[in-house]
Amino acid sequence: METNKQIALRALTGAFIDRDPNVVEHFTANYIQHNPTIPNGPAAIKDLIPRLPKDFSYQQGMVVAEGDLVMVHGRYVGWAPKPVIAVDIFRIEGGKVAEHWDVMQEEVHASDSANGNSMFSAPEEK
């Protein structure tokens, strides 16, 4: 049996790394989307995938899970004019992604940060 973490990561990997439109099989039929630029429903995810720019990339960072919620810290390049750091929050229901929220912010490099820290560290960078 897959964990909620594995389900959320499969959704992110399928959509943004593999660019597999069949990833929507892992979303509920009444999938709720809270990103204001993406409609509700798995069809919106399927439509989004082929529209990703050729130079688009996604890098997963920290993952935290509690109950039916999974939060993933990630770096999106090509989503916006500059790289974006995001926290994606997924609600899992019946082994599928049922709901999604995200908070996105343009990346500020450590050299430009008041504290000298980067906004993102991939697991392999720790």
Which residues make up each language-model segment?
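C-terminal and inter-domain tail/linker signature
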Residues: M1-K126
